[in-house]
Swiss-Prot record:
It comes from the Eukaryota. GO terms for cellular component: extracellular region; membrane; other organism cell membrane. Residues 28-45 form a propeptide. GO terms for biological process: defense response to bacterium; innate immune response. The modification Leucine amide is found at L59. Disulfide bonds: none annotated. It is found in: Secreted; Target cell membrane. This is Mastoparan-M. Residues 1-27 form the signal peptide. It comes from Vespa mandarinia (Asian giant hornet). Antimicrobial and mast cell degranulating peptide. Has broad spectrum antibacterial activity against both Gram-positive (S.aureus MIC=32-64 ug/ml, S.xylosus MIC=2 ug/ml, and S.alactolyticus MIC=16 ug/ml) and Gram-negative bacteria (C.koseri MIC=4 ug/ml, E.coli MIC=8 ug/ml, K.pneumoniae MIC=48 ug/ml, P.aerugiosa MIC=128 ug/ml, S.choleraesuis MIC=32 ug/ml, S.typhimurium MIC=32 ug/ml, and V.parahamelytics MIC=64 ug/ml). Affects membrane permeability of E.coli. Shows hemolytic activities on sheep, chicken and human erythrocytes. Keywords: Amidation, Antibiotic, Antimicrobial, G-protein coupled receptor impairing toxin, Immunity, Innate immunity, Mast cell degranulation, Membrane, Repeat, Secreted, Signal, Target cell membrane, Target membrane, Toxin. One of its GO terms (molecular function) is toxin activity.
Length: 60
């Protein structure tokens, strides 16, 4: 019984991951999958360079 639940749970998580990645690909079809987030496609994307600059400024 535990094995069946584990297999079903794993399959469910795999499907969520697959459809989640498909939704990202549809939202920005010309994006490079190895590149970071495209700020033009996602206006709420995290700006890592700005965060790094702020941390460097705060920490000296």
């Amino acid at each position: 019984m535990k094995n069946t639940i584990l297999i079903l749970f794993t399959a469910f998580i795999a499907l969520l991951g697959f459809f989640g990645m498909s939704a990202e690909a549809l939202a920005d079809p010309k994006a490079d999958p190895l590149a970071g987030p495209n700020p033009d496609a996602d206006p709420e994307a995290i700006n890592l360079k700005a965060i790094a600059a702020l941390a460097k400024k705060l920490l000296g």
